[in-house]
Amino acid sequence: MNKTTSKRLLALDILRGITIAGMIMVNNPGSWSYVYAPLGHAQWNGLTPTDLVFPFFMFIMGISTYISLRKYNFEFSHSAALKILKRTIVIFAIGLGLAWFSMFCRTWNSLSAEEISFFSRLGQSIWTFDHIRILGVMQRLALCYGATAIVALTMKHKHIPYLIATLLIGYFILLITGNGFEYNSTNILSVVDRAVLGEAHMYKDNGIDPEGLLSTIPAIAHVLIGFCVGKLLMEVKDINEKLGRLFLIGTILTFLGFLLSYGCPINKKIWSPTFAIVTCGLGSSFLALLIWIIDVKGYKSWSRFFESFGVNPLFIYVMAGVLAVLLGNIRVPFDGTTTSLHSYIYKGILQPLLGDYPGSLAFALLFVALNWSIGYICLLYTSPSPRDKRQSR
């Protein structure tokens, strides 16, 4: 790997790390009743800083998919397809596992007051598949990765932009004709999810599952845009030309998305076409900014914190999910009764010391720091030593 490529990948790791840290922070406030406006999602139409973190990660996944598939020369083979399928299934299964683990812990706690045997309680807690959420963040990542990888190996890359446009335009037509911009159960997205998945297996938000089946269509287009940006990153050698193209793509996509939002609202929960376009544009511009800071100016000492998140992003995200479930379900004595460890830390320590909103933010930051410390330890043990680096040259 040449020097330019190495630096370019460092900037990508940092952006990935920033998004993972952001996802962990906004998903784990001390109290959902006390969240600063920029750290909350838009209720329906609109865009907040928090709405950027997940689509940024999807965008980065598209770039990484291009990089990882180069070893196959983008030619379809049974071995490549098998590896893609295996990775897709594993990521999807991990997402289901997280959903099951959360349901197991909640069910176990809800049965604590009932006079039933240990094994009966255990059995009821384990068997929660009749109302487990099927889709989610990890599942969306899996489906979009699998679809993008197969497209990359079976379609000429010069045709991918046309596929992206077809997916986004087709999805917009679906939204227009299917009441898709309404925030209720008459929305075509809700209708399809209830018919295919069943209401018991959906996220509860006015009938809308933000990671539902139909909204996976524009999400695939989203990752494909990242794939095309990855192609640019790896093929353009001159750093100034690379930055110029990234900023140009980012500016055009952002301007186009906001312009089209007058007829197609920007909406994360339905992953509207304009949401995909705008967030990919902002992601491209942000990546260009990081490359300029890290590669051109050489300011990279600050990035070590985010590198810990960016090198093993899925591991950190899953670990954060498990820790969040444990904090929310481990019971401890508090004020004459019992409460979750999460609630105890916030209500018993941070809220009295700092207040409602600052205490809630402090909890989120401390949780990020906890996950960073684990990620940093993993980075230390997985990074090659200076001696190993010398021997590999």
Predicted features and spans:
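N-terminal signal-anchor module of multipass membrane proteins
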Residues: 2-73
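Functional transmembrane helices that form membrane-embedded active or gating regions
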Residues: 5-14, 19, 243-255, 273, ...
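Extracytosolic (periplasmic/ER-lumenal) interhelical loops and adjacent juxtamembrane/interface segments
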Residues: 34-43, 115-124, 181-208, 336-356
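Membrane-interface transmembrane-helix boundary segments in multi-pass integral membrane proteins
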Residues: 47, 209-219, 268-279, 284, ...
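Transmembrane alpha-helical segments and their boundary/interface "anchor" motifs
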Residues: 51-54, 71-99, 103-148, 152-171, ...
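Specific transmembrane alpha-helix
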Residues: 54-70, 141-150, 214-235, 253-259, ...
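Long hydrophobic alpha-helical segments that form multi-pass transmembrane helix bundles
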Residues: 157-221
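Conserved small/polar residues in nucleotide/adenosyl-binding loops
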Residues: 381-388
